[in-house]
Amino acid sequence: MNYFPWLTIIVVLPISAGSLIFFLPHRGNKVIRWYTICICVLELLLTTYAFCYHFQLDDPLVQLTEDYKWINFFDFYWRLGIDGLSIGPILLTGFITTLATLAAWPVTRDSRLFHFLMLAMYSGQIGSFSSRDLLLFFLMWELELIPVYLLLSMWGGKKRLYSATKFILYTAGGSIFLLIGVLGIGLYGSTEPTLNFETLTNQSYPIALEIIFYIGFLIAFAVKSPIIPLHTWLPDTHGEAHYSTCMLLAGILLKMGAYGLVRINMELLPHAHSLFSPWLVVVGTMQIIYAASTSSGQRNLKKRIAYSSVSHMGFIIIGIGSITDPGLNGAILQIVSHGFIGAALFFLAGTSYDRIRLVYLDEMGGMAISMPKIFTMFSILSMASLALPGMSGFVAELIVFFGIITSQKYFLMAKILITFVMAIGMILTPIYSLSMSRQMFYGYKLINAQNFSFFDSGPRELFVSISILLPVIGIGIYPDFLLSLSSDKVEAILSNYFNR
């Protein structure tokens, strides 16, 4: 038991300090921006300090645990703790949220509410990744939806209300299944409700009931991940949202679904997962091909990047379905890797829109001449997205490949077929990625326009882009830094499958 409540402070600080924004004196938006950035930086420093000095890498058990009785009436606890699975997403959340607040510098309308919602979302996300109680996980999952809905409906494009409504209908529908699953597991087989992850890991269920629970959780996480065919909210949402919100959606929100699949479906329901894993692999493979080929036909720049996100999430699903050490490690690495790359691409797409006020690729062209810095950063990150060796995406996708090839669960012909289809998906990725760069940056369309006067990236935008690029290259060159965090926990999860 840890005596200093590090995780409680990390979870509660953003939303509690964020609520003080409304009491700041009226001295323009600059005060609010700096205050929000300071909270995010302080939070990131606290998280890094707590993990560096209080987290043992060689211990697969839950660390920094906190366990407080919250509501006596139905045995509800405030249980927090981290292990090798949650440490990567928590650090990713802190990093991306800090850069997203910096990216939101141009937002001037209702600035207080905007920054408060970003901080409230931050608390919900950290809470989801660090909760060790099933009901607390559900509460944090829901807490995070409200700020996202408001951010989508109040700031963005002309169809933002439509996309926000679509988002909330999909996610609230998924949350119903999540709540049913949480209550079903908590109330099963005992007079006292049991919601503690540690207790539930050792709980066994009749196979039919376990399959029902599994399907309920799978639907909830499939909406968030997103897994086809529950992905249609994502392109609309990304197409209309402000780019700082897109950074949070692509960088963190999608990763919550993948995290939930590993944390609940894999860890708590191993029998059902071993039955469903072949279907997950098939759906993941279809998703890579479908999203990559659909992305090529998108005229809207942000929708094209959104479909590329759906395609990359396919690798995570295949890694989770492979039930192997490399497959699951690769999926966790891809969660962090795509969090950085997706956020960076949306940021650069948004800064480009701020300058040229165009969203359709066939209206762009010639940006490379007037904006060489944006061109350079976008080109490098496009290469990272298509898994160029030396970038984080390459390592993650390669390890997932090894995972599916070395899996004992599938026949040789099935593995060859899956690998072949995945390889086709990886060939389709450069097609939409490089054609996107060509349509945006090459040619003369914008130069021939009457009001041709565009300025390149300023110091703030360059700082955000480089800050995201450095971890992408760092993970690509030395992936062991992240893999060493998760490998012990992955072995502990997979021991449920091989000891039966």
Curated annotation (Swiss-Prot):
<feature type="transmembrane region" description="Helical">
    <location>
        <begin position="134"/>
        <end position="154"/>
    </location>
</feature>
<feature type="transmembrane region" description="Helical">
    <location>
        <begin position="242"/>
        <end position="262"/>
    </location>
</feature>
<comment type="similarity">
    <text>Belongs to the complex I subunit 4 family.</text>
</comment>
<dbReference type="GO" id="GO:0042773">
    <property type="term" value="P:ATP synthesis coupled electron transport"/>
</dbReference>
<keyword id="KW-0793">Thylakoid</keyword>
<dbReference type="GO" id="GO:0009535">
    <property type="term" value="C:chloroplast thylakoid membrane"/>
</dbReference>
<keyword id="KW-0150">Chloroplast</keyword>
<keyword id="KW-1133">Transmembrane helix</keyword>
<keyword id="KW-0521">NADP</keyword>
<feature type="transmembrane region" description="Helical">
    <location>
        <begin position="113"/>
        <end position="130"/>
    </location>
</feature>
<dbReference type="GO" id="GO:0048039">
    <property type="term" value="F:ubiquinone binding"/>
</dbReference>
<keyword id="KW-0520">NAD</keyword>
<feature type="transmembrane region" description="Helical">
    <location>
        <begin position="167"/>
        <end position="187"/>
    </location>
</feature>
<keyword id="KW-1278">Translocase</keyword>
<keyword id="KW-0934">Plastid</keyword>
<dbReference type="InterPro" id="IPR010227">
    <property type="entry name" value="NADH_Q_OxRdtase_chainM/4"/>
</dbReference>
<feature type="transmembrane region" description="Helical">
    <location>
        <begin position="272"/>
        <end position="292"/>
    </location>
</feature>
<keyword id="KW-0874">Quinone</keyword>
<feature type="transmembrane region" description="Helical">
    <location>
        <begin position="411"/>
        <end position="431"/>
    </location>
</feature>
<feature type="transmembrane region" description="Helical">
    <location>
        <begin position="207"/>
        <end position="227"/>
    </location>
</feature>
<dbReference type="GO" id="GO:0008137">
    <property type="term" value="F:NADH dehydrogenase (ubiquinone) activity"/>
</dbReference>
<keyword id="KW-0618">Plastoquinone</keyword>
<dbReference type="InterPro" id="IPR022997">
    <property type="entry name" value="NADH_Q_OxRdtase_chain4"/>
</dbReference>
<feature type="transmembrane region" description="Helical">
    <location>
        <begin position="330"/>
        <end position="350"/>
    </location>
</feature>
<dbReference type="InterPro" id="IPR003918">
    <property type="entry name" value="NADH_UbQ_OxRdtase"/>
</dbReference>
<dbReference type="GO" id="GO:0015990">
    <property type="term" value="P:electron transport coupled proton transport"/>
</dbReference>
<feature type="transmembrane region" description="Helical">
    <location>
        <begin position="4"/>
        <end position="24"/>
    </location>
</feature>
<protein>
    <recommendedName>
        <fullName>NAD(P)H-quinone oxidoreductase chain 4, chloroplastic</fullName>
        <ecNumber>7.1.1.-</ecNumber>
    </recommendedName>
</protein>
<feature type="transmembrane region" description="Helical">
    <location>
        <begin position="386"/>
        <end position="406"/>
    </location>
</feature>
<keyword id="KW-0472">Membrane</keyword>
<feature type="transmembrane region" description="Helical">
    <location>
        <begin position="37"/>
        <end position="57"/>
    </location>
</feature>
<feature type="transmembrane region" description="Helical">
    <location>
        <begin position="87"/>
        <end position="107"/>
    </location>
</feature>
<keyword id="KW-0812">Transmembrane</keyword>
<feature type="transmembrane region" description="Helical">
    <location>
        <begin position="462"/>
        <end position="482"/>
    </location>
</feature>
<dbReference type="InterPro" id="IPR001750">
    <property type="entry name" value="ND/Mrp_TM"/>
</dbReference>
<feature type="transmembrane region" description="Helical">
    <location>
        <begin position="305"/>
        <end position="325"/>
    </location>
</feature>
<dbReference type="Pfam" id="PF00361">
    <property type="entry name" value="Proton_antipo_M"/>
</dbReference>
